[in-house]
Swiss-Prot record:
It holds the Pfam family Gasdermin_C. Belongs to the gasdermin family. Expressed in the gastrointestinal tract, specifically from the middle to the upper region of the gastric mucosa in the glandular stomach. Disulfide bonds: none annotated. It comes from the Eukaryota. The gene is Gsdma2. GO terms for biological process: programmed cell death. Intramolecular interactions between N- and C-terminal domains are important for autoinhibition in the absence of activation signal. The intrinsic pyroptosis-inducing activity is carried by the N-terminal domain. Residues 1-249 are annotated as: Triggers pyroptosis. InterPro entries: Gasdermin, Gasdermin_pore, Gasdermin_PUB. A cardiolipin binds at R9, A10, L11, A12, R13. GO terms for cellular component: cytosol; perinuclear region of cytoplasm; plasma membrane. This is Gasdermin-A2.
Amino acid sequence: MSMFEDVTRALARQLNPRGDLTPLDSLIDFKRFHPFCLVLRKRKSTLFWGARYVRTDYTLLDVLEPGSSPSDPTLLGNFSFKNMLDVRVEGDVEVPTMMKVKGTVGLSQSSTLEVQMLSVAPTALENLHMERKLSADHPFLKEMREYKQNLYVVMEVVKAKQEVTLKRASNAISKFSLNLPSLGLQGSVNHKEAVTIPKGCVLAYRVRQLIIYGKDEWGIPYICTDNMPTFNPLCVLQRQGSTVQMISGEMHEDFKTLKKEVQQETQEVEKLSPVGRSSLLTSLSHLLGKKKELQDLEQMLEGALDKGHEVTLEALPKDVLLLKDAMDAILYFLGALTELSEEQLKILVKSLENKVLPVQLKLVESILEQNFLQDKEDVFPLRPDLLSSLGEEDQILTEALVGLSGLEVQRSGPQYTWNPDTCHNLCALYAGLSLLHLLSRDS
């Protein structure tokens, strides 16, 4: 992960813990995430480990009929952050035979980041909605309609108030130093990084979905379900004054919802033939620990789905094609796996070889089930049976796997320290383990 991503993710956590503020991934794209910019949501995004959006070259104003410009976004507040990337420094902790936990010392940030939060005012949106109709024949809208793409409008942004150069130096790759040569996680690297963030750079943002109905009517609902498409002439919208709102039931985000979501996606993968599942496992096994290649595969599948192309993976027989629902499900799990660190991905490869994925899945499921809505850091007991069946090496692998998500497991007790900031990463780990467990059951 780049330093810019570290900064934007840390900023989003500080301003809106476990909320819907999305950190910007790429510095070069910041001009395409200003208020009223149109963006695409990556396929199979989920709020459980963070939705991701892709830039377009258009704004909402570009696809409306000509008319008056909306008023400037409203300033919601100014904020200042210093040493945002500093982490807690821990002393060396010896764990039996094969693992040493080290604090990531030497990480520093020498500058103060000053930001401001800006939002499109409700009155500005209402006036725009009343005064300007949709340009129904706009080529961009025609293309998006043809490929059934959902469009989202940037409604709120966090911007840098001044140009700032952030620096850091680190003397370790990760928190864990495992004495397992096959994982390639030993050793440390001394490196320095710096990133210059220009004045006005968007660092994080909030979006709302654009809904298009009729020939030239549009709306930006306050509430919108995932299965509501942007282009839907049959959708029912209610007007309250000049505000368009979607009729929608209340959504509950808890562990049961995550579990149901993951089960639905695994069911689609399960529909593959045994040969297809085995070949998919082979392909993923070669890519785990190679995060860039996983991301490339994700982009390739997204592009194929957008254009309606058939897809085969390298390890799949030529007659085993991935149908759309299976590709959607694989994209969902790729999104989860790419949220994990390369160290975690390498540990998953070893865990797969050692056949300990079922235990690891139960452990993560138990922790999330107990603490999903817990918003304070605390120490909780761990069921002894969750780790007692593992040998020494497998227990260390499992502790490191969840530890790299930010969850500290202590054998004394046993117990673990829950940190709400780790929830998103643990959700991604839960989904990744669910897929690999399913695929490895036949092997």
